[in-house]
């Protein structure tokens, strides 16, 4: 755990050295909620009936979708980006010279990215609340648990992408395909009931479909977690199966990279 915290701190120090960029990025995110508000207001009459079981308010519906997508984007993209960067600048070799475990290495690489995503999420939620989004704050803990479970279903996919970087120095189209399909089929901008029936069937293979439905019912409607038991069970299934697959894939890629001596080369 200490090793992971040290990596997280080092990455925060690197980001903190670009203070102007950090400030403008933060302010830009806070302001970006304004056009989302006006767009959602314009579409509210059209969307109200299709989202009646997920809050009925399109502004809150859209904000929750964008927040969830930001987290899965981090889950699938942060790890392989860190490996690519650290191999390229030689810092991975230096880190591996220390007595760090692979779980600590992965946690350290992901920790800073998720901390930054949490900060951005809070700014977006505060801005949305100030503009009148209906958020049931008493369900914040339950919503965080649901979001965490959704992220746990996507982290294994990010680990597989990192394994591709270790073995082949490229992820190929995998991360883009995952995020693209999740955005298109997972219900980020619209409920899955609004898409053609054959695509709606395909959305059942996307973890975000279950995560967003449960999150909106809880954080917008104020429903208890038990109302989304089926969706939460599906997320647990995705997380368990994909974790087992990613462990095997990453182990093989790590062993191959060490034998080939390519961990310090890009």
Ranges and model annotations:
Residues 1-266:
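Hydrophobic transmembrane alpha-helices and immediately adjacent juxtamembrane helices
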């Amino acid at each position: 755990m200490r090793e992971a915290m040290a990596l997280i701190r080092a990455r925060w120090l690197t980001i903190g050295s670009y203070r102007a960029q950090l400030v403008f990025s933060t302010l830009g995110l806070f302001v970006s909620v304004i056009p989302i508000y006006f767009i959602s207001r314009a579409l509210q009459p059209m969307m109200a009936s299709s989202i009646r079981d997920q809050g009925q308010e399109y502004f809150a519906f859209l904000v929750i979708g964008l927040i969830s997508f930001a987290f899965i984007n981090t889950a699938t993209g942060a790890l392989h980006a860190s490996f690519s960067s650290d191999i390229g600048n030689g810092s991975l070799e230096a880190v591996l010279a220390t007595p760090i475990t692979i779980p600590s290495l992965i946690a350290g690489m992901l920790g800073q990215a998720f901390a930054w995503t949490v900060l951005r999420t809070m700014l977006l939620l505060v801005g949305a609340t100030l503009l009148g989004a209906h958020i049931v704050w008493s369900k914040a803990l339950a919503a965080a648990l649901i979001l965490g479970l959704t992220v746990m279903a996507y982290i294994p996919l990010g680990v597989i992408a990192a394994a591709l970087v270790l073995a082949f120095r490229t992820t190929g189209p995998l991360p883009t395909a995952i995020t693209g399909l999740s955005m298109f089929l997972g219900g980020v901008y619209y409920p899955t009931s609004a898409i053609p029936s054959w695509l709606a069937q395909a959305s059942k293979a996307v973890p975000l479909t279950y995560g967003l439905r449960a999150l909106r019912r809880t954080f917008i409607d104020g429903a208890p977690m038990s109302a989304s038991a089926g969706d939460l069970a599906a997320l647990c299934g995705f997380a368990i199966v994909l974790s087992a697959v990613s462990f095997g894939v990453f182990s093989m890629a790590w062993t191959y990279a060490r034998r080939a001596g390519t961990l310090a080369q890009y």
